[in-house]
């Protein structure tokens, strides 16, 4: 009798650490009727050759949460599942060559402290005491991560698999998945051994995730945005001095990361393991001459140490004993990269009951947390922490393969680079352009990418330093500072215009459209001819998204939301759309100008319009402006008198020329951000996320607990109102000296 399952609640495709961790966490949640499929042996893809480093450090709040959870899980896993595991918690030292790096470390330290981590700053003398072989003469300081270390990736994966099996889940090795078929709300996963009918399916296929992802395209999916990179590290022969020190002290030396030189250096037995992230990096399987093989299980690329020559020499100068012995073994294997270097964890865009847990660059340290997050998505439909940073829906239709390849090369070669607040990375740009892009550039626009859309961050004047190097600072002052001040003052004192392409825009029509929205949002709907801001909550009353609702008729709405929210919010709206109600994405058909400031009405009159400019706040109308048909929304995110001019792309050049001729000064996203913070307006995923409830965010006026309709989170918000909120949104004036507080900075009182 065959033990091959023909039904399951969930089928996971891929038996690396992330897939197995997902199975383990599903089983822990009580979902034991789940199956994992692996085409070869567990760990056969990228997991088996991973270095196994386990930092808690990250500059991303979501990633730090995942890694913190992983390390806690790994510490007790061997005992929990009764499986031996080599896990060495050695601590780690990150080296800083200058003040800028120390500032980055300080920000990460405070984030970690808020999460309960013991990350601390280190002096040069402390580093020398902790790592006696380290050359420190040119260092500014460092960062100590006491929880860092290394783990055996294969043992970790097998321990998770044993735990999952012991709870009743199924692992099918040497069982390649060959395709999927959607039947109603369920899936049939095809394999070499037969078909499995399931409720949900998860793509955890590692560097084969793009190939597996193609199976879902007939059902609304897209090509998984990723590129496979070659990552190389080598192990030295035994080093006598290191062996002697280890035996005398009863421990390994800490893991070392020289982030300014872009490598990690770790003790492996009595030798060293050096792993650089080189600028002259190499992508694989991206050309017809180098196709992805059908099976690359437990295989490596040929050694290519010449690429690493500079990094090897630099590391030998930093830790001279590295050069005392020869190379024992070279590992050169495939690692998948998303365009921003962060994994894809969450709902598969456009496909119901399908999920992704793939494209992990640091899958070992993130694997435990990723399995937890995926299991929460699958079983609860929401996650404990806000995970937008890794949500697959953060990427939309602009991520073609050329873009993915360019960004992967850039991110890999700058793996340890600092992400300064005024710096824009140059690779993969100009994917989506405004109808007046050339005019904005001609006016001095210094551009930034927002969900692929190019928008001006600020406007440079002749003689301003616009070099790449000028943005390599955490300081507020730079060539942009005076220009941003001038732009903000123009909006405050006169009138400014911001070209704002890329607003996500949906048309909702049909019998029942209004009642559908009432059952989705926490507040009420606007009257015909008006608009309002509506909030969508999850089942805990936390902030899922915010959308501007423009009402044209009883059952006709335009829904406008952030550029980055396009696929996320489409999923939120489309997931339970009733019959007879139609949702259409018009994002690419229209563009927007923000005309705002105390003289905005005068500017609009000068442009020539038949609009009624006396209509009040949160009204909308269709009008002719500068001879062009457009929609006028009486609203401004800058907090001043103003209108949003929404028009078809073909009409925008004439409108832009007219508003400039009428005296409006171009301003950019940096000035807008300053103005909206001054007003106290919140930004989605900056200030508002699923880490906070609507009541904690101070949005009570957008919550109608007395309305008859049930909506997600209503019961939770009612309970929170009775019990009292645990956190409160606050606007602070902070004396920050020369530096603005970067996103997710911790402020201590």
Label each region the model flagged.
Residues 421-447, 455-457, 476, 552-749:
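Conserved, structured C-terminal
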């Amino acid at each position: 009798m065959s033990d091959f399952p023909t039904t399951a609640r969930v089928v996971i495709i891929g038996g690396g650490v992330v897939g197995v961790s997902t199975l383990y966490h599903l089983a822990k949640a009580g979902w034991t009727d789940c199956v994992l499929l692996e085409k070869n042996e567990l760990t056969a893809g990228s997991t088996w050759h991973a270095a196994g480093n386990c930092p808690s450090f990250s500059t991303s709040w979501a990633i730090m949460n995942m890694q913190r959870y992983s390390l806690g899980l790994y510490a007790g896993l061997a005992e929990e599942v009764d499986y031996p595991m080599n896990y060495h918690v050695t601590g780690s030292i990150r080296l800083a060559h200058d003040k800028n790096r120390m500032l980055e470390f300080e920000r990460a330290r405070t984030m970690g402290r808020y999460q309960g981590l013991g990350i601390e700053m280190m002096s040069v003398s402390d580093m020398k005491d902790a790592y006696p072989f380290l050359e420190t003469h040119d260092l500014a300081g460092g960062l100590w991560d006491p929880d860092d270390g290394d783990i055996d990736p294969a043992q970790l994966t097998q321990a998770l698999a044993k735990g999952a099996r012991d709870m009743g889940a199924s692992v099918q090795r040497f069982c390649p998945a060959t395709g999927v078929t959607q039947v109603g709300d369920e899936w049939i996963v095809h394999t070499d051994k037969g078909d499995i009918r399931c409720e949900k399916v998860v793509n955890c296929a590692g560097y084969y995730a793009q190939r597996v992802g193609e199976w879902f395209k007939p059902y609304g999916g897209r090509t998984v945005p990723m590129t496979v990179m070659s990552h190389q590290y080598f192990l030295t022969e035994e080093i006598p001095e290191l062996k002697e020190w280890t035996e005398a002290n009863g421990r390994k030396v800490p893991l070392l990361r020289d982030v300014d030189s872009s490598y990690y250096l770790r003790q492996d037995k009595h030798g060293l393991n050096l792993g650089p992230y080189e600028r002259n990096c190499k992508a694989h399987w991206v050309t017809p001459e180098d196709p992805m093989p059908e099976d690359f299980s437990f295989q490596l690329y040929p050694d290519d140490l010449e690429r690493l020559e500079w990094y090897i020499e630099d590391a030998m100068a930093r830790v001279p004993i590295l050069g005392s012995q020869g190379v024992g073994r070279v590992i050169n294997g495939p690692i998948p990269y998303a365009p921003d270097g962060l994994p894809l964890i969450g709902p598969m865009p456009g496909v119901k009951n399908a999920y992704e847990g793939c494209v992990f660059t640091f899958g070992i340290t993130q694997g435990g947390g990723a399995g937890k997050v995926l299991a929460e998505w699958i079983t609860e439909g929401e996650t404990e922490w806000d995970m937008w940073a890794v949500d697959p829906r953060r990427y939309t239709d602009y991520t073609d393969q050329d873009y993915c390849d360019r960004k992967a090369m850039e991110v890999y070669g700058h793996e340890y680079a600092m992400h300064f607040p005024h710096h824009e990375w140059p690779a993969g740009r100009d994917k989506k352009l405004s109808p007046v892009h050339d005019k904005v550039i001609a006016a001095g626009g210094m551009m930034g990418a927002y969900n692929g859309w190019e928008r001006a961050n600020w406007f440079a004047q002749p003689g301003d330093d616009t070099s790449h190097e000028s943005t390599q600072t955490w300081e507020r002052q730079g060539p942009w500072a005076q220009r941003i001040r001038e732009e903000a003052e123009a909006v405050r004192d006169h009138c400014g215009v911001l070209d704002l392409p890329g607003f996500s825009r949906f048309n909702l029509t049909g019998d029942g459209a209004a009642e559908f929205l009432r059952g989705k949002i926490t507040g009420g709907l606007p009257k015909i001819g008006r608009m309002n801001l509506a909030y969508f909550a999850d089942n805990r009353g936390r902030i899922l998204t915010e959308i501007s609702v423009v009402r044209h008729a009883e059952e006709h709405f335009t829904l406008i939301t952030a550029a980055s929210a396009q696929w996320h919010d489409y999923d939120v709206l489309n997931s339970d759309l009733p019959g007879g109600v139609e949702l259409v994405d018009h994002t690419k058909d229209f563009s927007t100008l923000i005309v705002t400031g105390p003289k905005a009405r005068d500017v609009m009159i000068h442009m020539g319009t038949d609009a009624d400019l006396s209509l009040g706040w949160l009204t909308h109308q269709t009008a002719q402006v500068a001879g062009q048909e457009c929609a006028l929304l009486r609203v401004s995110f800058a907090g001043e008198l103003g209108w949003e001019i929404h028009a078809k792309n073909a009409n925008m050049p004439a409108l832009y020329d007219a508003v400039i001729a009428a005296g409006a000064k171009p301003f950019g996203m940096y000035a807008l951000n300053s103005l909206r913070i001054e007003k106290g307006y919140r930004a989605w995923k900056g200030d508002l996320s699923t880490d906070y409830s609507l009541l904690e965010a101070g949005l009570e006026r957008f919550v109608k607990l007395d309305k008859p309709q049930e909506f997600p989170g209503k019961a939770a918000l009612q309970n929170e109102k009775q019990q009292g909120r645990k956190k409160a949104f606050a606007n602070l004036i902070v004396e920050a000296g020369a530096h603005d507080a970067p996103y997710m900075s911790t402020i201590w009182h």
